[in-house]
């Protein structure tokens, strides 16, 4: 495995998704911004139905006015070679207890002890990972069957970095079974089981949270090689949340890099 790209740590536990970061506020989100228009008081009311993505600017203005929003459509033919200042290093080979909950927006897994990744020489600690019934990002317009978002945060700067693992229909995933069977409980999980065999190739760009408050300056890493999940597993997650994905946003002046 290439250490310059992606690997998972001896202190890490489990990963998570990225849009939802109720347990961390990015450094650049001031209290004024977060509370504007009653954001903090009303954030719990956003959803994917009557208060869905087209109304999220009512909960956080950034969702409607931000110029660097996520998710986006990745067009491989329009990407640039990776700036290696942003190479990602994860350290695998860990297992530990993690709590699994239905938080009203997705199925979320939170490790008892945080893991970490290294990004441009800085450490980002694992906060949680969660699932979307379909991928939020698309590649050449294609939406994957499922996605896991692994959310990490720099403890000093509070900047966020999210690793996205796509899933396609195929062989059953052991780690997904563990998650499905233990919602509302704690269970021992190994984060290495969530990663594809080829975790050394990915897309990178700077975007945002994919849920309110839609805060920007989030480092996104989307693994190119998907994992597989059985038809039954995919259908089970969609029983919880069939449409918990935000529509793709405009790229504007951003560059998508590929490694």
Which role does the model predict for each range below?
Residues 2-8:
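Sec-dependent signal peptide recognition
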Residues 4, 18-259:
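Alpha-carbonic anhydrase
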Residues 11-12, 39:
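Residue-level signal for mature regions of secreted extracellular proteins and peptides
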